[in-house]
């Protein structure tokens, strides 16, 4: 024993010498979050409504310069997360099924990303958005992207129906080191995923209660000794003001994220990055710092955590205002939103944390080849023009919705056309149109489907899409009226806000007649809450036309019309008692 004692002392001394020093003060860790990039790895060129200097807003090369500045400011103690819907939405991303975004994220150094509903949109690897050939894997494109990523795809509430376990290509959570702090990151997906993606692509998966999934994952992470837990969730909220993080007055308390956070026991998590709703959040909800920036790579969110690593807890937090992603700003504003630009304002370089922002060369070199490969198709002129911007709309009739509904109705020869507002992703700009303009409006690989329906089924379709927050159906061949105050106290499953449905001449639908209704195959497959209705319709009354996707059908009809498009709202949809935005 005497002879072994010096050896014990030596081993103890060696262990102490090799262990990292424990900081006397809390460790400051900065969490940076993006969400709903939707394939916009390149910036948007936008101009003020009244004319003037255009600005490039967003893009991964510009984002990289901000992230690097924050890393420099905080000695590298930065955790970078994304809250989902990374890939779907632009020609340059969709043509390569999201690969450009993954490769850009790899260079940026993301630590984790939540699985959003639109991650499933591409279906199998290749041009088909759903399985059409024996041996195709409906999750093939997503699995490929997960394999390319240097960071995990996370969802604690997504399980395989066959096993009840998380798919092999994803994880429930991950743990990263940031300085001396050990940070757990949980991912969540919206439980509504089967209704807001192509349902056939998630037929093997279940999306469970996110509250229970968060509590279970957090318990496991605490047992593994993490100092803080961050959630990246494709679950969102809506707040119209972000100036006072402690006031929820401007927030919709019925939104998914608010409900989830208010259900969590105290101390379950330490920070929450929301997504899915394309709106800003900067609020403490149930004591939890919660952040969400604008979609399409226009903003990022930041939460600062001060971590007591000796006691595995967060002792202080702060939510910074959402930060616009741009290398130039309008003088006197420190922002690049052209809607708020002063008249004739000039652009100046953006200063951030003492650094001048400019696109990161490494990220640009990674994504630029994808842009070059689609440039010719994107810039292809269609020989069609608009006299003014054709606006989309979510809660009422829109000029662009009318054009699309008219186009697919004419192309199909159907009696009636409906188009989900959520499938119209951009306004149509004024002037001569390109294929890229049409793609921005209709990026999803949806095809026209003609469904034979009776009057009661048409009424149920309109009822279901006006009973909640999904966005109403744009129409051609019918008119309808919605009273937003009607049945407010009823559950959305039975709420009926539709007060009238007529043909364009004002006559009612014939209850004994069958009508042909053209719609995106997404709706025909049960999307946007249509599952129960579509199951009630015999399969031989549904025909999907795979020859041309809706965007190319739109191009064909616009060329056939051969006339300038002018915005027009014609009274197809009448909205009563619609509350103005706060």
Task: Give the positions of each predicted feature.
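Loop/turn elements at helix/coil->beta-strand transitions in domains of secreted/extracellular proteins
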Residues: 26-30, 74-79, 108-111, 148-153, ...
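Catalytic centers of hydrolytic enzymes
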Residues: 24-34, 39-72, 107, 196-211, ...
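Active-site environment of divalent metal-dependent phosphoester hydrolases
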Residues: 39-42, 87-90, 115-126, 130-131, ...
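Bacterial signal peptide processing site
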Residues: 17-19
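C-terminal motif of bacterial Sec signal peptides marking the signal peptidase cleavage site
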Residues: 13-15
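Divalent metal-coordination and catalytic microenvironments
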Residues: 36, 63, 85, 113, ...
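Functional cores that coordinate and move charged inorganic groups
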Residues: 141-142, 146, 171-183, 190-353
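Core catalytic region of metal-dependent phosphoesterases/phosphodiesterases
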Residues: 60-162, 261-265, 293
């Amino acid at each position: 024993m005497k002879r072994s004692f010096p050896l014990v002392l030596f081993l103890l001394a060696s262990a102490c010498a090799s262990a990292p020093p424990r900081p006397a003060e809390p460790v400051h860790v900065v969490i940076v979050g993006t969400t709903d990039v939707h394939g916009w790895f390149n910036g948007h060129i936008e101009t003020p409504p009244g004319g003037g200097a255009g600005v490039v807003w967003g893009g991964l090369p510009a984002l990289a310069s901000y992230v690097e500045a924050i890393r420099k400011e905080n000695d590298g103690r930065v955790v970078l997360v994304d809250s989902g819907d990374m890939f779907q939405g632009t020609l340059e991303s969709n043509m390569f099924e999201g690969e450009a975004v993954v490769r850009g994220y790899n260079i940026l150094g993301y630590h984790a990303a939540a699985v959003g509903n639109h991650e499933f949109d591409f279906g199998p690897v290749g041009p088909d958005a759903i399985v059409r050939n024996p041996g195709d894997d409906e999750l093939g494109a997503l699995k490929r992207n997960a394999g390319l990523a240097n960071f995990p795809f996370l969802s604690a509430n997504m399980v395989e129906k066959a096993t009840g376990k998380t798919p092999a290509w994803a994880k429930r959570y991950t743990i990263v080191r940031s300085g001396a702090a050990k940070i757990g990151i949980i991912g969540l997906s919206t439980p509504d995923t089967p209704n807001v993606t192509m349902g056939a692509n998630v037929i093997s998966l279940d999306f469970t209660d996110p509250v229970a999934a968060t509590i279970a994952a957090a318990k496991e992470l605490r047992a593994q000794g993490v100092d803080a837990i961050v959630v990246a969730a494709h679950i969102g909220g809506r707040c119209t003001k972000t100036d006072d993080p402690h006031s929820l007055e401007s927030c919709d308390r019925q939104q998914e994220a608010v409900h989830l956070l208010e259900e969590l026991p105290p101390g379950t998590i330490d920070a929450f990055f929301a997504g899915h709703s394309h709106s800003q959040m900067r609020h403490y909800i149930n004591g939890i710092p919660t952040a969400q920036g604008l979609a399409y790579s226009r903003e990022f969110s930041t939460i600062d955590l001060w971590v007591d690593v000796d006691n595995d807890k967060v002792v202080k937090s702060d939510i910074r205002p959402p930060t616009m992603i741009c290398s130039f700003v309008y003088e006197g504003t420190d922002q690049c939103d052209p809607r708020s630009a002063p008249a004739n304002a000039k652009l100046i370089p953006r200063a951030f944390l003492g650094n001048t922002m400019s696109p990161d060369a490494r990220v640009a070199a990674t994504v630029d080849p994808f842009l070059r490969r689609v440039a010719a198709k994107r810039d292809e002129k269609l020989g069609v023009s608009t006299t003014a911007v054709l606006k989309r709309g979510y809660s009422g009739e829109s000029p662009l919705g009318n054009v699309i509904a008219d186009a697919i109705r004419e192309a199909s020869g159907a009696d009636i056309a409906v188009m989900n507002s959520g499938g119209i992703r951009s306004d149509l700009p004024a002037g001569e149109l390109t294929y890229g303009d049409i793609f921005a409006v209709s990026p999803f690989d949806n095809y026209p489907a003609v469904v034979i329906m009776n009057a009661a089924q048409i009424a149920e379709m309109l009822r279901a899409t006006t009973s909640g927050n999904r966005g109403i159906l744009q129409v051609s061949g019918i008119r309808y009226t919605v009273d937003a105050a009607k049945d407010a106290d009823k559950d959305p499953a039975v709420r009926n806000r539709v007060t009238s449905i007529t043909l364009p001449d004002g006559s009612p639908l014939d209850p004994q007649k069958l009508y042909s209704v053209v719609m995106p195959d997404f709706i025909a497959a049960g999307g946007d809450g249509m599952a129960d209705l579509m199951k009630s319709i015999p399969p031989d009354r549904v025909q999907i036309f795979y020859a041309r996707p809706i965007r190319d059908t739109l191009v064909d009809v616009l060329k056939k019309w051969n006339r300038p498009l002018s915005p027009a709202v014609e009274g197809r949809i009448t909205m009563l008692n619609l509350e103005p935005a706060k």
